[in-house]
């Protein structure tokens, strides 16, 4: 796991990447940003009252040299953000509503990213996923050609690294959604120097069972191959046929995956969430994420049970997405 983050840190160091942290009074956030700034890995921006944040840092024996602190209540560029917010929401928010919304740290931080004053955002240590993701969907929005954002985990154990998706966002993706998730997950894998070999998972392998659910995955494979013919991608697979070469030889002998997949696309959020937690708890894999993909600019959501190391690592990932 250290190798993964060492590689990412080398990639982002010296690139002058600015990451905003809306939860400026959270101890874990402050510990992480102090270390990020001290290591000169990236340039942290913390949101909140400067006096309160500095007092909290002093209480924790942390130095915040190199850390910018922006307070929505006193920020000089607020009017520009208000106008940009109103324009971006296209009739869904008045100036008064925009000013009120931008006093919320997550909306304020997201607007900094949208306006190019920061390159990415990390939140969620003290907020729900909805509080973190909603401003991003309203303001930053998804990339052209991408209808929905999705969430992946990098599953790492020693030298092994796999991508699991979607384990965080889309409850019941349809065929189009699954194809999109597969392509975006392959792009995320490349960001971590993982050459993607994508398996679309089901309880059937290449038509061994027939149902609406298996047909959904089979259709997703066709759509993904049409949209990204250069990708090594196939399905539908049971997990063993995607992961174990000897099983693949029996169940899917003609597939280009050959039991050597490293990007696994689950057919539903239910399956994906259960799958990554089984790998984490029974297989002793470290689960890094969820990493949100498909947005125009990177926004990532921490678990409220995170520690300072989790914050540090997700900030590195967010910075890498911004490059």
From Swiss-Prot:
Chief location: cytoplasm
Localization of this protein: Cytoplasm
Catalysed transformations (reactions): acetyl-CoA + phosphate = acetyl phosphate + CoA
EC number of this enzyme: 2.3.1.8
This protein's name: Phosphate acetyltransferase
Broadest EC class assigned to this enzyme: transferase
SUPFAM superfamilies recorded: Isocitrate/Isopropylmalate dehydrogenase-like
The organism of origin for this protein: Bacillus subtilis (strain 168)
Lineage: Bacteria, Bacillati, Bacillota, Bacilli, Bacillales
Pfam families per record: PTA_PTB
InterPro entries documented for this protein: P_Ac_Bu_trans (IPR012147), P_AcTrfase (IPR004614), P_AcTrfase_dom1 (IPR042113), P_AcTrfase_dom2 (IPR042112), Phos_Acetyltrans/Butyryltrans (IPR050500), PTA_PTB (IPR002505)
GO BP terms in the entry: acetyl-CoA biosynthetic process
Domain of life where this protein originates: Bacteria
Pathway(s) per entry: Metabolic intermediate biosynthesis; acetyl-CoA biosynthesis; acetyl-CoA from acetate: step 2/2
An annotated GO cellular component: cytoplasm
The family this protein is said to belong to: Belongs to the phosphate acetyltransferase and butyryltransferase family.
Keywords: Acyltransferase, Cytoplasm, Transferase
Any GO molecular function: phosphate acetyltransferase activity
């Amino acid at each position: 796991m250290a190798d993964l983050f060492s590689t990412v840190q080398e990639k982002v160091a010296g690139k002058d990447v600015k990451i905003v942290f809306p939860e400026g009074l959270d101890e874990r956030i402050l510990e992480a940003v102090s270390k990020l700034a001290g290591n000169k890995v990236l340039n942290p921006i913390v949101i909140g009252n400067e006096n309160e944040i500095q007092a909290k840092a002093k209480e924790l024996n942390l130095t915040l040299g190199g850390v910018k602190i922006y307070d929505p209540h006193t920020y000089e560029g607020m009017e520009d953000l208000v106008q940009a917010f109103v324009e971006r929401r296209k009739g869904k928010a008045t100036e008064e509503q925009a000013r009120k919304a931008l006093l919320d740290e997550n909306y304020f931080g997201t607007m900094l990213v949208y306006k190019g004053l920061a390159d990415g955002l990390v939140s969620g240590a003290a907020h729900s996923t909805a509080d973190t993701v909603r401003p991003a969907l309203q303001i930053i929005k998804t990339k052209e050609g991408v209808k929905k954002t999705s969430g992946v985990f990098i599953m790492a154990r020693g030298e092994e690294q796999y991508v699991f998706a979607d384990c965080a966002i889309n409850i019941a993706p349809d065929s189009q959604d699954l194809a999109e998730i597969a392509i975006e997950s392959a792009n995320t894998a490349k960001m971590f120097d993982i050459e993607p070999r994508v398996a679309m998972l089901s309880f059937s392998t290449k038509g061994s069972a027939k149902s609406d659910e298996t047909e959904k995955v089979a259709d997703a494979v066709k759509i993904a191959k049409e949209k990204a013919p250069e990708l090594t991608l196939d399905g539908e697979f049971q997990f063993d046929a995607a992961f174990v070469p000897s099983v693949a030889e029996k169940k899917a002998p003609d597939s280009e995956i050959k039991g050597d997949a490293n990007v696994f696309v689950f057919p539903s959020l239910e399956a994906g969430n259960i799958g990554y937690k089984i790998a984490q708890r029974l297989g002793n894999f470290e689960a890094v994420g969820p990493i949100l993909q498909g947005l125009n600019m990177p926004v990532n959501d921490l678990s409220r049970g995170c520690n300072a190391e989790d914050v540090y690592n997700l900030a590195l990932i967010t910075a890498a997405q911004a490059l």
